[in-house]
From Swiss-Prot:
This is Neutrophil defensin 2. GO terms for biological process: defense response to bacterium; defense response to fungus; killing of cells of another organism. HANP-2 could be a product of proteolytic N-terminal amino acid removal from HANP-4. It is found in: Secreted. One of its GO terms (cellular component) is extracellular region. It comes from the Eukaryota. Keywords: Antibiotic, Antimicrobial, Defensin, Disulfide bond, Fungicide, Secreted. Belongs to the alpha-defensin family. Bactericidal activity, greater against Gram-positive bacteria. Low anti-fungi activity. It holds the Pfam family Defensin_1. Disulfide bonds join 1-29, 3-18, 8-28.
Length: 31
């Protein structure tokens, strides 16, 4: 899985969030 922003790539599913410093990322996993 990867932490991405602003959105997950097509073909990936968001399963949660990551926080790095004061920035939130989406936790995206490939199916």
């Amino acid at each position: 899985c990867f932490c991405k922003r602003p959105v997950c790539d097509s073909g990936e599913t968001q399963i949660g969030y990551c926080r790095l410093g004061n920035t939130f990322y989406r936790l995206c996993c490939r199916q």
